[in-house]
């Protein structure tokens, strides 16, 4: 099977099965939770950071629920009037908003502080009018965001939030457990390493390797 046939098969799979599981177009979030992360760039960033060791719906509903508990969603107020311990306590309060409230409290408070000091309190300034490589580099500077998450963010920003990214060839596939298994079983790569999976995706779809994440997300 040629690369174009593999890509077409994945696109057909996404169209047939992917919509229901899409965090932004499926039924995993309430309308209010979905609208919040799609219209508020800071909520999107918080959801991205929270997407760790929990179900996707738990992570991406967290920003809305945290805002309800805070009574606001101002990055300046979080950075200057709260602490990582206070955020952790809010996350820990039953029903808990995350499996690891302590770590997540530190990550989210740190994100609010960085947004306030470097991006005028608005995450949209991270990805406005810059390349994919710059977006990834900026996102990786935030505690709790790995290269995998930063690559996933680029895909979601383009696919679901309508952010224009010119150099899509620099958006890598997310090194996700499901993708790794499929790539190995399909023989796209021989080893389960970041390097091998990334290079395989670049061979399969050189114009936009990160798109291959989409059918599984």
Locations of the language-model features?
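Alpha-helical ds-nucleic-acid-binding substructure associated with the helix-hairpin-helix region
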Residues: 69-158
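Structure-specific DNA junction-binding interface
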Residues: 1-75, 84-98, 104
């Amino acid at each position: 099977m040629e690369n174009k046939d593999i890509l077409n098969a994945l696109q057909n799979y996404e169209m047939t099965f992917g919509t229901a599981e899409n965090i932004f177009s499926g039924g995993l979030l309430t309308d209010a939770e979905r609208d919040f992360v799609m219209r508020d760039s800071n909520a999107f960033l918080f959801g991205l950071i929270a997407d760790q060791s929990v179900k996707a719906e738990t992570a991406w509903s967290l920003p809305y629920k945290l805002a309800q508990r805070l009574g606001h969603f101002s990055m300046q107020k979080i950075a200057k009037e709260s602490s990582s311990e206070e955020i952790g306590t809010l996350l820990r309060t039953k029903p808990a908003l995350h499996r690891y409230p302590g770590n997540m409290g530190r990550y989210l408070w740190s994100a609010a502080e960085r947004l306030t000091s470097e991006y005028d309190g608005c995450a949209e300034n991270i990805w406005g009018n810059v390349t994919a490589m710059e977006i990834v580099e900026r996102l990786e500077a935030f505690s709790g965001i790995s290269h995998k998450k930063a690559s996933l963010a680029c895909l979601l920003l383009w696919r679901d939030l309508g952010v224009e990214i010119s150099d899509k060839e620099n958006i890598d596939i997310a090194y996700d457990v499901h993708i790794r298994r499929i790539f190995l079983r399909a023989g796209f790569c021989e080893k389960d390493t970041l390097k091998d999976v990334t290079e395989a995706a670049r061979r399969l779809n050189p114009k936009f390797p990160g798109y291959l994440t989409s059918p599984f997300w």
